[in-house]
Each structure stands twice: as structure tokens, then as C-alpha cells.
């Protein structure tokens, strides 16, 4: 009888220790998440969230991350949304690249009209266009990551606001 009581006490203590360890880990992860949102630079921030949301994690890991996001306060969620929105805006080249291309074409046309040798101008144009396309491709990748992460934060915020209005 005493052995059973001792075993029960040990099991209860063991479960309590496990719960405390899990709670401490969650608190550390929440602090790391808030730290990432508030202090990481753009590339670090995108890399952090890309790692957390990339395909290939265990299902429980995704659920744990979602519940961790849900534990963030509204102010932190709003700040995260504004940061990712800012990344989206600064990497949106659709506003000025269409204006830049005709100007570049006009420059090349004038250059070809003034000079007989076209190989230098052609290689300059090809190099410039390749550099622009490469920059746009890299920036578009960052923009797409920011948009997808921003959507996650918007969904979490909407859910939190909805849950608060029910209470």
C-alpha cells in the first residue's frame, strides 16, 4: 500500500517537473520570438521565421509554434505586422521598375545613335539588365517571405480579437 502511494507521489512529482520544464521552455521560446520580432534585422527576421515555418518539421512543432504565436500580446502582433508590411513595401519594385526600363531604353537608343561601336554598349546593357533582374529576383524572394509571414500574424491577430470579443 505504501509502495503504491509512494509511486503515485513520485509519478505526480515527475509530471509536475515535466510540466514546469515544458512551461519554462515555452517561456524561453516566447521570449526568443518577441526578441526576434522587436530586435532582429530584416534578413535575420526573415531567416528566423522561414526556419520556423518551412516544410519538413513535425506536425507537433508547427502546432507548438502556432500556439506560441497566439500567446503574443496584441501590441507585439501589430508590431510584427507593421515590420513585415514594411519589408513588403520596400521590396515592391512594381512601382519604379516600369518607369526605369523606358528611361534605360531611351539612354541606349541615344548611345547607339552617337557611337559606331555597339559591342561595348550592348554588353553594358546586357550586364545592367542582368544585374537588375537578379536584384529583383532576390528582393522578390524576401518580399514573398514577408507577405506569407505577415498573413500568419494577421490571422493570429484576427483570431485573438475574435476570441476577446466572445468573452
Curated annotation (Swiss-Prot):
Q: How does it sit in the membrane?
A: Multi-pass membrane protein
Segments spanning the bilayer are 96-115, 119-138
- Give the CC-aspect GO terms: plasma membrane
Where in the cell does this protein reside?
A: Cell membrane
The highest taxon in the source lineage is Bacteria
Question: Does the keyword Membrane feature in the UniProt annotation?
Answer: yes
Keywords associated with the record: Cell membrane, Membrane, Transmembrane, Transmembrane helix
Q: Does the keyword Transmembrane apply?
A: yes
Q: What is this protein called?
A: Uncharacterized protein YjcP
Q: Which organism is it from?
A: Bacillus subtilis (strain 168)
Amino acid at each position: 500500500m505504501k509502495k503504491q502511494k509512494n509511486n503515485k507521489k513520485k509519478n505526480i512529482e515527475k509530471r509536475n517537473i515535466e510540466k514546469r520544464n515544458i512551461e519554462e521552455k515555452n517561456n524561453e521560446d516566447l521570449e526568443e520570438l518577441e526578441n526576434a520580432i522587436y530586435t532582429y534585422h530584416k534578413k535575420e527576421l526573415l531567416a528566423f521565421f522561414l526556419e520556423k515555418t518551412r516544410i519538413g518539421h513535425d506536425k507537433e512543432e508547427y502546432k507548438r509554434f502556432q500556439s506560441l504565436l497566439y500567446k503574443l500580446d496584441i501590441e507585439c502582433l501589430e508590431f510584427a505586422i507593421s515590420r513585415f508590411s514594411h519589408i513588403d513595401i520596400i521590396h515592391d519594385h512594381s512601382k519604379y521598375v516600369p518607369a526605369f526600363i523606358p528611361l534605360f531604353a531611351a539612354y541606349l537608343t541615344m548611345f547607339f545613335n552617337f557611337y559606331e561601336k555597339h559591342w561595348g554598349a550592348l554588353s553594358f546593357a546586357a550586364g545592367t539588365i542582368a544585374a537588375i533582374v537578379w536584384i529583383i529576383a532576390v528582393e522578390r524572394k524576401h518580399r514573398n517571405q514577408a507577405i506569407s509571414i505577415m498573413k500568419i500574424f494577421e490571422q493570429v491577430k484576427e483570431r485573438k480579437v475574435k476570441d476577446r470579443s466572445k468573452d
